[in-house]
A protein has these predicted regions:
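N-terminal carbohydrate-binding accessory modules
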Residues: 1-68
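A cross-domain feature marking catalytic cores of carbohydrate-active enzymes
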Residues: 6-10, 73-77, 109-113, 163-166, ...
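A short alpha-helix capping/helix-coil boundary motif
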Residues: 37-40, 73-77, 128-129, 188-190
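An active-site-proximal structural segment forming one wall of the substrate-binding cleft
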Residues: 44-71, 81, 85-113, 123-164, ...
Length: 247
């Protein structure tokens, strides 16, 4: 399938620079601190209104009218609503699939954030913190989440594939990006121990993720992985017969 699509950023995963009004009255720079900086009822109201208005069925119709055939939808690790104080958004993704299938579009689900963050970026959920790979319980949670997404959507006509993890940061890029100076952590104590993800760990995680997802996704659905900003290191990865339709 030749992909000609658009990314629906800032709908289900917030990015302050795209919707600064959501952050009015707070010092929060990312989605982790937003609900901790507002009364719960105010936070919930802002999020629910944003999600209902930012992307609608009309957008899918417009995307189709432009001759595109796919949308990439970033989703957060709390999509199923099981990570308080965040509000889940599985209903919105369900709607997106209904709209996509109505207008003959394909969806790439992109797991954009994980607990503890995979990169320390503001769009990774919490600025200046990158500890996900060092927290076994968070890694296991992520595998379980990917399996749940694959089980729910794996056989949907509108699914192009699932991206395992957005922009994990590996050794070469950690220093180049100067993460903790570019994205200042709010809580220095929480940020202690942050660091890049090794390629060895990332390869192992991708293989584990492929296997749990493929149990629920037929081979015509793609498993997509990010190169960690180090494209050359993946030349011979997943070349074995076991791995089908990997992007």
């Amino acid at each position: 399938m030749y992909i000609n699509g658009v990314n629906l950023g800032n709908w289900l995963v917030l990015e302050k620079w795209m919707s600064p009004t959501l952050f009015y009255g707070t010092d929060a720079e990312d989605e982790y601190y937003l609900p901790r900086s507002l009364p719960q009822d105010v936070y919930e109201s802002r999020i629910k209104i944003h999600r209902s208005e930012y992307i609608t069925e009309r957008d899918f119709a417009t995307i189709k009218s432009f001759g595109l055939n796919a949308v990439r939808i970033p989703v957060p690790y709390f999509i199923f609503g099981d990570c308080k104080p965040f509000i889940g958004c599985i209903e919105e993704l369900d709607k997106a699939f209904n709209w996509a299938e109505k207008y003959e579009l394909s969806i790439l689900i992109d797991l954009h954030t994980v607990p503890g963050s995979q990169n320390g970026f503001d769009n990774g959920g919490i600025s200046g913190v990158c500890k996900w790979a060092k927290q076994p319980e968070s890694v296991q949670f992520t595998l379980s989440l990917l399996e749940r997404l694959a089980e729910r959507y794996g056989k949907r006509k509108g699914l192009y594939g699932i991206q395992i993890l957005n922009e994990p940061i590996t050794e070469k890029m950690w220093d180049l990006f100067d993460i903790q100076n570019r994205y200042k952590p709010v809580d220095e104590e929480m940020a202690k121990g942050s660091g890049p993800i090794s390629l060895k760990f990332l390869r192992s995680f991708y293989i584990d993720a492929y296997r749990v997802m493929r149990k629920h996704m037929p081979e015509d659905k793609a498993v997509v992985f990010h190169d960690g900003f180090d494209l050359k290191s993946w030349k011979d990865f997943m070349r074995e017969e076991e791995f089908k339709n990997v992007v």
